[in-house]
Swiss-Prot record:
Cited Pfam families: Ribosomal_S2
Gene Ontology cellular-component annotations: cytosolic small ribosomal subunit
Gene3D superfamilies (UniProt xref): Glucose-6-phosphate isomerase like protein, domain 1, Helix hairpin bin
GO molecular function, one term: structural constituent of ribosome
GO biological process, one term: translation
Name listed for the protein in its UniProt record: Small ribosomal subunit protein uS2
Similarity comment text for this entry: Belongs to the universal ribosomal protein uS2 family.
């Protein structure tokens, strides 16, 4: 096993280089910005490549020494990816709302985890039938609520040794708690974020779905590398196992935008985007686009293809930037 390899081409294809609108930047990120195009900051991937390698090495080294990695990503486009990467690498995750004190008040969190385990036992035991329908429903709701917040860390058994974070602005409480306890943080830091206090900073787009998938896949594979090294250092012969460890390689399919069959709840007013009329909004809807967050997740090439289909190809980058702003304002 070895650290996962990646290329600058992969980063470009995933849209890692796209930052936020230039007027929404954090000046502390100036040294990591290559320039601006259409009022969108472009991240210097020549710096991202070695910094990402350093972060992956830190992850692998932490796990090789027996440490635990906690994946943190609670924004909508990161939730499923973060959970999948953590599960695939036998680590831990928080992908719902971060509960204040998750790290700094671990004793209380442990009590809640104990309650979650107890509810699991109650609902899965043969005695579950002794409860009334209303009692079972109440217990199930309590169990589901706890599982959303704590399900990814219920088997952690103690504080993590390293945090991997998507979006340092959104996860600022988690980062502050880690800093108070001296837990190192590896994080994807966009152009609107403050890099202060991040142990292993990786300048990159923290909004695009493809970029988030790439980061999480690389970190998961770095964890697997660390686990393999730990087994080798202990003299354990993984090759002698009846069922040897396997690294699950992700199936990389050609990126293809998939619209929604209909809006999720109330559709957003897409006419708030510059140059979007009622007719163009209808074209967006025909393509399955009803919400700003859908546009905010688009990579560069897909955004241009969609803007061509609605008749305004020159607006692609501006629409994505505006959609990000409007999504964050929700």
């Amino acid at each position: 096993m070895a650290l996962p390899e990646f290329s600058m081409r992969q980063l470009l294809e995933a849209g890692v280089h796209f930052g936020h609108q230039s007027h929404r930047w954090n000046p502390k990120m100036a040294e990591y910005i290559f320039g601006a195009r259409n009022n969108i900051h472009i991240i210097d991937l020549a710096q991202t490549v070695p910094l990402l390698h350093n972060a992956l090495k830190a992850v692998s080294d932490t796990v090789a020494k027996g440490g635990r990695v906690l994946f943190v990503g609670t924004k909508r486009q990161a939730q499923d990816v973060v959970a999948d990467a953590a599960k695939r690498s036998a680590q831990y995750f928080v992908n719902s709302r971060w509960l204040g004190g998750t790290l700094t008040n671990w004793k209380t969190i442990s009590a809640s985890i104990k309650r979650l385990r107890h509810l699991d036992e109650m609902l899965n035991s043969g005695d579950a039938g002794s409860y009334t329908k209303k009692e079972r429903l109440t217990l199930q709701r309590e169990r589901d609520k706890l599982d959303r917040s704590l399900g990814g860390i219920k088997d952690m058994g103690g504080l993590p040794d390293l945090l991997f974070v998507i979006d340092t602005n959104k996860e600022d409480i988690a980062i502050q708690e880690a800093q108070r306890l001296g837990i190192p943080v590896a994080a994807i830091v966009d152009t609107n974020c403050d890099p202060k206090g991040i142990s292993y900073l990786v300048p990159g787009n923290d909004d695009a779905g493809r970029a988030i998938t790439l980061y999480c896949d690389l970190v998961a594979r770095a964890v697997i590398d660390g686990l393999s090294r730990a087994q080798g250092d202990s003299g354990y012969d993984a090759g002698a196992m009846a069922q040897p460890l396997r690294e699950e390689l992700p199936v990389v399919a050609e990126a293809r935008f998939q619209g929604l069959a209909g809006p999720r709840g109330v559709a957003d007013d897409l006419k708030k985007l510059t140059g979007v009329s009622g007719a163009i909004e209808k074209k967006f809807n025909d393509l399955g686009i009803f919400h700003f967050w859908q546009l905010a997740e688009l990579d560069h090439d897909t955004a241009h293809k969609i803007s061509e289909e609605v008749g305004l190809p020159s607006r692609a980058d501006a629409w994505v930037a505006q959609a990000k702003t409007l999504t964050e304002a929700e």
